[in-house]
Every structure is written in C-alpha cells, then in structure tokens.
Amino acid sequence: MKIVSFSLEQGNKYFGDIDKDRFFIGKSVPYLRNKGLINNTGTPGQKYDRNDFRPAFGFWADFIHPTAMAEGALYHTLNTYDGAHFTFSFLQFAAHVPNGDFVRYFRELLKLPLAAQYFPDLALHNNRISLITGAVPVSLESDSSTTDLMEYLNPSIKSIESTEVIQAAKFIHWVQNDPQHRQTQIEIGITIFKEKMVEYARRYGLDGVADTICLVIADIRHQGRASSAEIQTALRSSKPLDNLLDIGKSRFPHRIDVLRQEIGVLTKAGTLGVRKYSAAKNDFV
C-alpha cells in the first residue's frame, strides 16, 4: 500500500512523498468563494505527445492534440476548486458527471495491477466505483449522481483538507510512475472523443465536414463554452471555422489562442485540413 505524506511549503505549495519519492502536488488557489489545488506545471516528458500514440490510434492522436494543449496536456493536470470537486488528466476529466469521462477513467484505473496499492479501499463492484468498508461494497457513483465519489476525493471546495491533498497525491504519483496509467488516460480520452463525434455528426450535420471544423466543435463541447444554437449559427456562416473559433474568445482568450496556434501548426504540416468526417465509418477519411 502506498503511504502518502505531505508538507505545505512556501505559503501555498503542497509537496508529497510516496516511497521516498518527493513530488509537487499542487498550489493552493482561491476561486470565487472556493479554495482548492491546482497543478498545471511539469516537464515536457510529463505531457501528452501525439507522436507516441499515433501508431496505436492513428489520426485520432492528432485530432485530440489541440484540445489536450488547451487543457494543459500534462498527465497530472489537477484542479480541485470548482463545482466538479476533482478534475484530473491531460484532458481534465471532471468527477461531477455521472458515467462521464472521469468516472469511466477511474473505473479503468481500478482494473490496473497497481490499483490496490494506491486505493486499497476501493474496488469495482457491478462496474461501479465502490468503497470496501465491510462485507457489502458501497457504490460511490450511479447513473444519476457522483456526489459520494466527489466527497471521497475532495470533501469540500470551500477549503483544502488533508483528504483532498492525499487523494490528489495518489493520482499524481501513480500517473507519473506507471505507463499503464498514462495509457489508460489516452485510451479513455480518444474513446470518448470518437463516441462524441457520432453524436455531434448527427446533431450538427457533420458527415463530410472538414476535420478542423469537427475538432473545434468537439473542443467547444468538451469545455462546454457554448450552446448548440451558437454552434449551428457559426456552421451556417460563410466562415464556419473562424466563427467557431471566435466562440468564447472574450471569456477564454488563452484557450482560443492555443487552439488557433495548434490548429495552424497541424494544418501547415498537412496533418489537419485534409480529412473529412465519415459518419458511416465513424472516422476521418
């Protein structure tokens, strides 16, 4: 079992220690009336690199790249200060959505060999993340709620508790030291983007539409920064890509700048701008 110790240093920075390995957990930040942890710093080797995953996932490894960069791209990207209570991964999977990306990700993590080392009190029971407190496992999530899971990870977003720091430390140390954990992040991220493209193609009429336009729509929906009506209005315009990229630029200027930059680089390289989405194949051709 992995034992976590941690210290608060320099006023607002938390550092952890597992197996005599010291690492940065995150820094304390205020958010509206909340308070939590953020970790968005790391080395290039701790970031998603599409080249590493193209052999296994093909163009989809490139397709998610701009969104990954906009989300920070670090496998240990963390925030615990907003309504999701706990957000983690290179695509910032959020714990507040029932059967959502974080829940699906955590379920898969609990199947890995090291799961019992990091979370000995959890197990999958009927494919639900469950707390093992006695003879009967107690599910922490359902089709309608993840409240118990959020509280398990981070009891309150009003202050920083030891539980929150320890759970964050486990996720960070695990992903930094286990290639299978990182692979799981990628598999879940790409699987969900592929599934969502089926929905988006149907809702927005994206069969035969350019990869760049599909990518921006997927990013908008991933972040949740616009309604379907706004997306449809941009799609009907004379410059759909530009108008889609303009959505949310006043509220999220950095994210939009990153998207524009990464799409531009990949387009110039001939990676983007040459494929269209095929609804029949659920793939870009």
What are the language-model segments listed below?
Residues 1-208, 212-285:
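Cell-wall polysaccharide-cleaving catalytic domain and substrate-binding groove, primarily
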